[in-house]
């Protein structure tokens, strides 16, 4: 079964970038919360960069997944589509939960700094810092597991369809594809209808 970087590593890299963003925040906290003039606002830096990078990688994975979906959905069970979408949902839930934890952390640190209670500032930040790391790792593993399972199962069923072992129609998304006639006017006569042959693993 053919593999390439585009199809099978974007989800992993996206979740890795997200986790690293919150892990590096612990290093940032050690420098920004222990100086003579602690600054809580810098705690947004690495998580923000991690979220942006992760979102870009995941965007391309979703884009490529959806590119041929209207035509290839007839050849694999629709439950794998829901499995993939569940992975996407968990990914964004991961971001949401960690942004909330980060906001609580910055608010707590800002209040303590404004009260000029610099003693134990970093120690008080550790629980939320490590909670964010733990949550990001846990939810990232779930997201990767769901997305990779969907990719693999779809690959397998597309290859079976290519070999003449199609999936039962009642298990697939059999809704018809809406064709834009304006876009097909310029196509040559004799184009073949969508089928399972060709590049079967672009999902």
From Swiss-Prot:
Give me the stretches of Polar residues compositional bias.
194-203
Q: Does the keyword Transmembrane helix apply?
A: yes
User: Any coiled-coil ranges, and where?
Assistant: none
Its transmembrane ranges are 9-29, 42-62, 86-106, 126-146
Q: Where is this region: Disordered?
A: 164-203
Task: Give the way it sits in the membrane.
Answer: Multi-pass membrane protein
User: Where in or outside the cell?
Assistant: Cell membrane
Sequence ranges of Basic and acidic residues compositional bias: 164-174, 182-191
Q: Which GO terms describe its cellular component?
A: plasma membrane
Say which domain of life the source belongs to: Bacteria
Q: Which UniProt keywords apply?
A: Cell membrane, Membrane, Transmembrane, Transmembrane helix
Record's keyword annotation contains Secreted: no
Entry-linked Pfam families: DUF5453
Protein's name according to its UniProt entry: Uncharacterized protein MG028 homolog
What organism is the protein native to? Mycoplasma pneumoniae (strain ATCC 29342 / M129 / Subtype 1) (Mycoplasmoides pneumoniae)
